[in-house]
Amino acid sequence: MSIEIKKSTKPVNYLDAVKFLEERVGEINKSEANELIWILEHPSTFTAGTGFDESDILDKSIDIIKTSRGGKITWHGPGQLICYLVINLNNKKRDIRKFVNIIENSIILSLNSFGIQAYSDRKNIGIWTKKNNEEMKIAALGIKVKKWISYHGFSININNDISNYNKIIPCGIKDKSVSTLKNIYNQNYDKLADEIIKNLITKLKN
């Protein structure tokens, strides 16, 4: 089957998005639907993955949605690019590590096309870059695999309010900074989503 590309122009409620993803997983499992790459944005939302620790909440007044993806606590909201993938790993030798590498390399390659030197870190998962020799996280990754079908995906901070990260220890990483592409490299990123889609499709078909 081919990969469907879906782009939402208005913010999508997080739980509504997860419901859609889970339904697509079931449809793919029955060979009733195509795989999916979905570009969207969420309203301001804190989510906690399966590795979540209560000590990562600094502001106890915030509402948190516990979710099935891997990883710890993070924030989603306006100005952030979300990319969800529903991909059948049965067709890819059930290699989760390779699939994660495809996602990471697609993000890095896409950012490189904007002149951004980005890299992954095996110890601290996500995509990083440097400004004035300081490491800063600009993309977070978290997936879930059910019946060897992967869903959830990643987020890239483009022009969002990073003060929300002060309420948590993002991804449980205490000694690193979180930033946005606009804060580090002030340029137009309107074509970034298209670049990511192109690179993901190319690498997923290899």
For each feature predicted by the language model, list its residue ranges.
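N-terminal lobe of the biotin/lipoate ligase/transferase fold
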Residues: 1-138, 145, 190
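Short active-site-adjacent structural elements
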Residues: 48, 151-152, 165-167
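Solvent-exposed residues in well-ordered beta-strands and their adjoining turns
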Residues: 88-90, 144, 157-159, 199
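C-terminal accessory segment of soluble enzyme catalytic cores
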Residues: 128, 162-206
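Conserved phosphate/anionic-ligand binding catalytic regions in large, soluble enzymes, centered on
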Residues: 149-159
